[in-house]
Amino acid sequence: MRKNRSAAVAAASFLLVTGAAIASAPSAYAGTPGGTHANDRNTDFNGDGYDDVLVGSPGAAVGGYKGAGMVTVQYGGPKGMGTTNVRAFSQNSSGVAGAAETGDNFGKAVATGDLDSDGYDDAVVGIPGEDIGAVSNAGGVVVLWGTPKGLTGSVSNWLQADDLTTSGRFGTALAAARFSDTTPGDLLAVMDSVGLTTYQFEPATEPGAKSVGPQSRQPQQKARTTLTSPPKTALARSGADEPPGIQPKSMTTGDYDNNGYADLIVSGTSVGDEPGHGWSYILPGTASNDEPLPVTAVRGGPVVASGDINGDGYDDLVTGEPHSPDDGGESMTGGMVGVYYGSSAGPAGQEGPGTPPVWWTQDSPGVPGTNERGDGFGTDLSVGDTNKDGFADLAIGVSGEDIGTVPDAGAFIVLRGAARGLTSTGALSANQGTTRVPGTVEKGDKFGGQVSFTDPNDDGRFGLLVSAPSENTNDGFVWVFSAGTGGITTSGSWSYGASAFGGPTADALYGAAIDD
């Protein structure tokens, strides 16, 4: 049973303004670390051992309010996921904090993690368009607690910025993992338009016991930092004298130095004299009694994902730059993806830490397609082992890909992992015109807008979810691709939208966010 669950922001020692790692001073809890490596899945809301799927539909009309937004959870099982064992939540659902309003965009961002260490993963939903009082688009976050029955929404926690600002968009991106040993649960990172806040929740009194619902409380302590100015204590990598400030866009987590604690990546695009370039800050996770490690910055972003591509036990960092200038800033490309391989010193480039990543484009040998302006190669990324060979594979969204003469129809590409790293051998590319893929190639669908590996039947082979949020004039659809001994296959693929479970469809943008 959960008792007296209150939220407290993790101590400020990890913040970029100090240049220290993610660690905090309170005495450590005993317990097995969870959620440290990228493949430590944390999407099991009912504790049955099967991954569940959390999908955001931020454009959904709820109670007549356009763009109020909703999320759905599809529960995994021996036969995988479907459209029958589904729950939908909005701010009009009983127990969910707030109320549905026009333009709230509930579900614009989603994340999962066991925040209270009770054995049931929890769902975190970003609401960046939330108006609070007279402050428009201040943003907010709702935590839906996992139970033996899954997500119930009977009680939820509400989080918001300490200092409300117009267009602050608190909840723009979310991530949860075990960054330190200050609590047995996962810490929650919440991004807004300029910075980052982390939250720590008290552990459940009786881990694994049947939940009767937590007490909903506001955070007791708060710590903040902005990222739009260069952190003075951050160490630059990848050929820059000083890392720039960034407009933060996304986050990912992984144990890149394999020290037993997750590291947090905050990614965005540069601001200042040379705007628009992708950069990512690495905030290392450490034990609370260890000397904090310095924050470092590497080229690449604003899209990021993590996983062990070469099977060496270190998570690797993958960055996507779908619309940014190339390294020289002289021309636009169709997008590029960078791979930093994990090491004892954290993510390392081609020649070790502090060097550029291994760059991939559609002009790289063996990669399907051709590098063309507007392709959006790297629109979204996901890393997972699709054939159970011990090497994680990389899914790449190419949402701006033209299919024949149809502009921006979209596609996805899967590159395989291997002992030597990412390889184009055995690469797969598919779109709505590919044999056995449901649907029709249409202008502006942006198929590949989201890609997410998931293993809802727990067979060790990660299938792939691919969304086209613009499908059917912004209604949105999600495609399900299974995995076999050869990895991802289009055989047996199927698709669904919000109508499959009676949800609102018009301009719903279903699949605009999928937890990864």
Predicted features, each with a name:
Residues G47-G56, S117-P128, D181-M191, N258-S267, ...:
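Acidic/hydrophobic-patterned starts of short beta strands in beta-sheet-rich repeat architectures
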Residues V53-V55, V71-Q74, F89, F106, ...:
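Hydrophobic strand positions within the blades of repeat-based beta-sheet folds
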